[in-house]
Amino acid sequence: MSRIRKPEVHVRGQQPPGGVERARLRASAAAFTSLVALAATGLVAGPAVGAPSAGPCALPRTSAHHSLGLDTWNGAYPQPVRTLDAVMVFLSFPDSTPLTAPAELAADHFPGTSDFFRRASYGRFALRAHAQPEWTVMPKDSTDYAIRRDWAAGKRTEYLRDAVAAADRKVDFSRYDIVYLVADPDAPGVDSDATKVVNLEHPVTADGKDIKRVVTVFERHPPDRNVLAHETGHVFDLPDLYHRPMDGKGDWDTHVGDWDVMGSQFGLAPEPFGWHKWKLGWLERSQVVCVQGPGSRLFSLEPLAAAPVAGGTLGNRLAVVRTGPGTALAIEARGATGNDRDTCKEGVLIYRVRNEAASGEGPIEVVDAHPRTEACWDRSVYPPLADAPLGVGETLTVADDGTRVEVADRTAAGAWTVKVTVPPPSL
């Protein structure tokens, strides 16, 4: 697609012991003054807290940024297994009169983003947005901040400092888990490619609340599809799955194509991978088939994006073969329902997971079951992977480890019968 992906930014800062209370938030300028941009490979580390699940197929979490290890949860991030409240602050500038009302901009993203996560989490997570009804006026012209995708650290610091100070006059930050700073899309200095999550190595405390990260939104009106779902995924410790070419040119979607919103917000099948759902706590261990070899195992997989039957159990949504200390093969069924309603092809999708690969460095790679063909060239972000899933009667032996995946049948209810054979370990 034509839009350039927007990696996260990590920012260092210093703040006085005890943070900045509401009555003293003007001191937030001092807290931000020394902020310096940190390379995108930096970490916002946190304590390990309650594991989403464990077992022989759960890879351990590593120090990689947004590691896909899931034996423990990174306590620096809110886990989306309850209701989380988000504030939307709308920022205007002296050099431009907004052409769009805050309510219209809020409607660009909500309830759509909340609905996306409600479906993806099977109702386990609710994102509740609180949109400020009026514009918050920034102290400087939009052009003064030099907003762009690869933003100069000093200018980004200035923007964040001014935004927090201006918003604090109206916002009680202690009430919110997530902060969205939404800029006037028609201001002359606003660049829509600058939308991203900004992580603060040293949180700024307002109203007794540590602000560890903010989502800076510079989208057009109307915005890119699912853009806020993608950015909010970072707030929950999910990595970028796209591949950024070294020269900034070429295709960004070679790792996962249309599959998962963290690969492309434009994708035809944006439902989060089953591995992501397992990490976030949306899948229980009982809904993950751990295939241990050598030998074969036959089981059924329900479509990942299918809503649970009222009064029924969720059923198997993911199968995993552990292939190494930090690697695994994941297998899931994808169907044209829910967030995947526009998918190019239904079937059983296979992908590799690496727990030591950082965000944007290939933590997930889809295995193409049809490497000589492509599909949906007029709609797909990466047609070579649009037909990656296996169909009924098809078999794939995965290179490197030799695991064989066979799709034996599909039931009338839509579940896929899958046989996985794990070879003996090589000598």
What are these regions (language model features)?
Residues 3-4, 18-51:
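Secretory targeting and sorting signals
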Residues 3-6, 59-70, 201-203, 207-218, ...:
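Non-catalytic C-terminal accessory/binding modules of secreted extracellular proteins
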Residues 49-221, 229, 247, 406:
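Zn2+-dependent metallopeptidase catalytic core
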Residues 89-94, 182-186, 238-241, 264-267, ...:
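Active-site-proximal beta-strand/loop segments in catalytic clefts of secreted hydrolases
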Residues 95-101, 269-274, 339-341, 359:
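Short, solvent-exposed loop/turn elements at domain surfaces
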Residues 99-111, 272-279, 345, 365:
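Short, polar loop/linker segments at the starts of domains and inter-domain junctions
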Residues 173, 178, 186-340:
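Extracellular hydrolytic enzyme modules, especially secreted metalloproteases
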